[in-house]
Amino acid sequence: GLDRFSIATDYYVQGLVALNRGDMSKAVAALDAMGAQEEVMSADREVMAPRLLHLALEGQIKLAAGHKEEALELIGRAEELEGSLPAEYGPAVPVQPMAELLADTHLALGNAQMAQHYYEFSLQRAVGRGRSLAGLRQLAH
């Protein structure tokens, strides 16, 4: 069978697709199916990714439901946990750096200064990452 990292990534993507379609119940179902509610501490990104993705999806669900502070708290917690991990080379694990997601969230909420801070922070760990660079370009206009 698939490992926890792959399962969590799949449910995360399913949850995001559901949110983008406005289907909150499917997004919540993906979050529930993902599991990973329990706190985990490891230096291994693939061990930590399910927890990070759970916090990220839960935060995005809260944001879609209009609970801005809870969304920032959950995604901020994911960013802190990811920030405690050693830097790695290669594709992002999980699929989106949590600092970038936090920047996207601040941008969506109209907080340009915090968005810029987290895009820049994301680029310190993922040099040249296109989505973070695009976020900074969007802020410049």
Question: Model-derived features: where do they sit?
Answer:
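Amphipathic alpha-helical segments of tetratricopeptide repeats
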Residues: 32-40, 76-87, 121-124
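Residue signature of alpha-solenoid helical repeat architecture, marking inter-repeat boundaries
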Residues: 3-6, 45, 49-51, 89, ...
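"A position-specific structural signal for the A-helix of alpha-solenoid helical repeats
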Residues: 9, 13, 50-53, 57, ...
